[in-house]
């Protein structure tokens, strides 16, 4: 069965019987003083795709801007940054991080999926806290997307996601090379071979390598997504993909728990199916936006095409 037809099973129905939250509660960890757009794009992409609620966990410096971008988002200035800890010693900083993660825990436990990285920056304190959050959600079994600056955590500590079968890494070309280097893999020649080696080195996690053709690898399994897309790469495009992917993982989680249908274990909705559908869908959104805007395309242009693209690919029977 085609990947798209299989994935349609996890899409929640449009029904008055569902209440708020059943179609997905997701979170975005990211947003710093310099980077407030990235978490916004990821969060709004998930909402436009069709999840019900999105929580953005960001630095205090980023919260006012993100709140002003959209009233649809629930924004928590929860992430401790270096600016918050300028006069603290390392032990005090660590205690501050632990306290902040503990305060987030009740919300983290309720999420259907989480994306870590958009706009996170290279702030060492924010990265340290993001690492604790990743450890927490892995202990909960929560589906996880690690993108952008969040991938620095995996570069620094490859064991962080080792063997976790509910995570998708979404590196671009340069991030992919750095991830490969962190586990002594040569990515300079054959990208397919390197992707398989990287996935296996991390315990067969799923990797979605973004490029002119998106490459998805889980262990020895590999596939390409080469659907038409925008001919111009704009800032925020990867954040949109991360948000879509997070939404799709949330739906998979809801489907597997029998939230809107009887539990059906007869068909395994693998992370490769989820990733390939997210890739294809994001490329369709970008292609529609490019048709209208050409060189003027920006990430907000792509957000506006999520609804039409979804109708075209998945809701064509409505």
UniProtKB/Swiss-Prot annotation:
Protein name, as recorded: ATP-dependent (S)-NAD(P)H-hydrate dehydratase
- One annotated GO biological process: nicotinamide nucleotide metabolic process
Organism of origin: Batrachochytrium dendrobatidis (strain JAM81 / FGSC 10211)
Q: Provide the reaction this enzyme catalyses.
A: (6S)-NADHX + ATP = ADP + phosphate + NADH + H(+); (6S)-NADPHX + ATP = ADP + phosphate + NADPH + H(+)
Domain of life the protein comes from: Eukaryota
Q: What class of enzyme is it?
A: lyase
Binding-site residues, ATP: 210-214, 229-238
- The EC designation for this entry is 4.2.1.93
Q: Which cofactor does it need?
A: Mg(2+)
* Annotated GO CC locations: cytoplasm
Gene Ontology molecular function: any one: ATP-dependent NAD(P)H-hydrate dehydratase activity
Compartments where found: Cytoplasm
Where does this protein chiefly localize? cytoplasm
Job description of the protein: Catalyzes the dehydration of the S-form of NAD(P)HX at the expense of ATP, which is converted to ADP. Together with NAD(P)HX epimerase, which catalyzes the epimerization of the S- and R-forms, the enzyme allows the repair of both epimers of NAD(P)HX, a damaged form of NAD(P)H that is a result of enzymatic or heat-dependent hydration.
Family as reported in the entry's similarity comment = Belongs to the NnrD/CARKD family.
What the entry lists under NCBIfam families is as follows: yjeF_cterm
Residues annotated to bind (6S)-NADPHX: 119, 172-178, 239
**Annotated InterPro entries:** Carbohydrate_kinase_pred_CS (IPR017953), CARKD (IPR000631), Ribokinase-like (IPR029056)
- Record keywords, A-Z: ATP-binding, Cytoplasm, Lyase, NAD, NADP, Nucleotide-binding, Phosphoprotein
Q: Where is the YjeF C-terminal domain?
A: 3-313
């Amino acid at each position: 069965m085609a990947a798209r037809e299989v994935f349609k099973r996890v899409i929640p129905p449009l029904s008055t019987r569902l209440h708020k939250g059943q179609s997905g509660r997701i979170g975005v960890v990211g947003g710093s003083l310099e980077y407030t757009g990235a978490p916004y794009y990821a969060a709004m992409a998930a909402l436009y795709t069709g999840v019900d609620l999105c929580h953005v966990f960001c630095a205090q410096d980023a919260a006012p801007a993100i709140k002003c971008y959209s009233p649809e988002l629930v924004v928590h200035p929860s992430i401790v940054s270096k600016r918050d800890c300028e006069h603290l010693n390392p032990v005090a900083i660590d205690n501050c991080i632990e306290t902040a993660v503990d305060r987030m825990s009740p919300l983290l436990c309720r999420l259907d999926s989480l994306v870590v990285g958009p706009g996170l920056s290279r702030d060492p304190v924010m990265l340290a806290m993001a690492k604790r959050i990743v450890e927490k959600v892995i202990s909960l079994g929560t589906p996880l997307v690690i993108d952008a600056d969040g991938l620095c955590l995996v570069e620094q500590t490859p064991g962080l996601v080792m063997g976790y079968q509910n995570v998708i890494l979404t590196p671009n070309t340069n991030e992919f090379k750095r991830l490969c280097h962190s586990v002594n893999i040569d990515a300079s020649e054959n990208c397919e071979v390197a992707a398989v080696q990287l996935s296996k080195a991390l315990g067969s996690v799923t990797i979605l390598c973004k490029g002119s053709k998106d490459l998805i690898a889980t262990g020895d399994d590999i596939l390409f997504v080469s659907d038409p897309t925008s001919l111009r790469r704009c800032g925020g495009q990867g954040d949109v993909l991360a948000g879509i992917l997070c939404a799709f993982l949330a739906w998979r989680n809801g489907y597997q728990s029998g939230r809107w249908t009887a539990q059906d274990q007869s068909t395994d909705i693998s992370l490769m199916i989820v990733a390939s559908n997210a890739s294809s869908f994001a490329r369709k959104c970008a292609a529609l936006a490019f048709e209208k805007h050409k060189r003027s395309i920006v990430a907000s242009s792509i957000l506006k095409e999520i609804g039409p693209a979804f109708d075209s690919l998945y809701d064509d029977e409505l």
